[in-house]
UniProtKB/Swiss-Prot annotation:
Belongs to a conserved five-gene operon within Thermoproteales denoted Arcade (actin-related cytoskeleton in Archaea involved in shape determination). One of its GO terms (cellular component) is cytoplasm. This is Arcadin-3. It comes from the Archaea. It is found in: Cytoplasm, Cytoskeleton. The keyword Cytoplasm applies. Keywords: Cytoplasm, Cytoskeleton. The keyword GTP-binding does not apply. Part of an actin-like archaeal cytoskeleton.
Length: 56
């Protein structure tokens, strides 16, 4: 298991913040900053924030 993800799980547990942190880490590793940005935009949309004006 990945040490960073393991530590995130220890600190945040199965909270929304922990899940977001895990998704951001995985996205960054797979697609770099653009991938992390996409995950963050999707998360903000789920919270009801208007992200239409944010550049991709």
């Amino acid at each position: 298991m990945d040490i960073l993800l393991e530590e995130v799980r220890k600190v945040f547990g199965n909270t929304d913040e922990g899940k977001l942190a895990e998704r951001l880490i995985v996205a960054y590793r797979q697609r770099g900053a653009r991938g992390a940005r996409e995950v963050l935009k999707k998360y903000l949309e789920e919270l009801g924030v208007d992200v239409a004006d944010i550049e991709s």
